[in-house]
Curated annotation (Swiss-Prot):
UniProt propeptide residues: 204-206
Protein name: Ras-related protein Ral-A
Functional note: Multifunctional GTPase involved in a variety of cellular processes including gene expression, cell migration, cell proliferation, oncogenic transformation and membrane trafficking. Accomplishes its multiple functions by interacting with distinct downstream effectors. Acts as a GTP sensor for GTP-dependent exocytosis of dense core vesicles. Key regulator of LPAR1 signaling and competes with GRK2 for binding to LPAR1 thus affecting the signaling properties of the receptor. Required for anchorage-independent proliferation of transformed cells.
Subcellular location field: Cell membrane; Cleavage furrow; Midbody, Midbody ring; Mitochondrion
Subunit description: Interacts (via effector domain) with RALBP1; during mitosis, recruits RALBP1 to the mitochondrion where it promotes DNM1L phosphorylation and mitochondrial fission. Interacts with EXOC2/Sec5 and EXOC8/Exo84; binding to EXOC2 and EXOC8 is mutually exclusive. Interacts with Clostridium exoenzyme C3. Interacts with RALGPS1. Interacts with LPAR1 and LPAR2. Interacts with GRK2 in response to LPAR1 activation. RALA and GRK2 binding to LPAR1 is mutually exclusive. Interacts with CDC42.
Organism name: Rattus norvegicus
Positions of modified residues (Cysteine methyl ester): C203
Enzyme Commission number, as recorded: 3.6.5.2
Amino acid sequence: MAANKPKGQNSLALHKVIMVGSGGVGKSALTLQFMYDEFVEDYEPTKADSYRKKVVLDGEEVQIDILDTAGQEDYAAIRDNYFRSGEGFLCVFSITEMESFAATADFREQILRVKEDENVPFLLVGNKSDLEDKRQVSVEEAKNRADQWNVNYVETSAKTRANVDKVFFDLMREIRARKMEDSKEKNGKKKRKSLAKRIRERCCIL
């Protein structure tokens, strides 16, 4: 009799997170801090880097897959493909750069266009909270935008690690809740189809 195989990575729930935002706002720094507990200040502009990690989410072991996309306009054309594969989005700007905050509206619009879903799991993230003296975007301004979009707003610092775990775990919870919701809807449709089929069969017998 074969021994039971240990639970492999393939059987763990996988949550796919996409990092979006302008170049230089700290998307890669946040990702690397979450993955490796390291702050990397000088980082080459990313085309797209993918990371995977096992974490414990509310007592359950899961995998998170993080795709760190490029902020530069040169790569805008290939973003659609990345967005299609994502289940949730961390939309990052720097609190020290108003332009990067303004750009979040374009990223949000592009995501909604590709996903065709206004309720896609999404967090607005104001990074570089350690640079309070250089702040250009007020908390109130960012929260107002998040409220308009019906999403949560969190400020982070990749340097001090403030709220880094929080944004990834909060987004994973949103993704998980969405999957459960979709699964219920799917099962409901299957039950309705099955019931309709039984009614049709009964009508044929009669």
